[in-house]
Amino acid sequence: MFGSLDISTSALVAQRIRMDTIAGNIANAQATRREDGQPGPFKRRIAIFETGDGQGRAGVHVSRIMEDPSVGQRVYQPEHPHAIQSGPYAGYVEYPNVDEATEMVNAILASRAYEANITAKDATKSMIAAT
């Protein structure tokens, strides 16, 4: 029975990390500089799940958070302070590869998965209490 609680708990932690990642993507959807201030747009991040915990226990965990390699949108805005200064894309601003609608859908899915795991955990606790 307690293994079931561990599985639900691991899923809750994984979904919380996924939600944090999605929130960061939404917050940086218009960021035209990287975190370190270097040129280039923010890159969307994705939480990668794996089963188990590497120690033989069941459940799920976030194995890593990777950057989405896809290219964001370039918008012609020569007056923008972060516009590309020279070359074929002079005057263009590179925006992140974050689609806010997709991120909102992912946030809803993560929220529903979190709720489902709370329900499973509560059901397990009820079964433990009944025995």
Q: Model-found features: residue ranges?
A:
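Amphipathic alpha-helical polymerization modules
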Residues: M1-T131
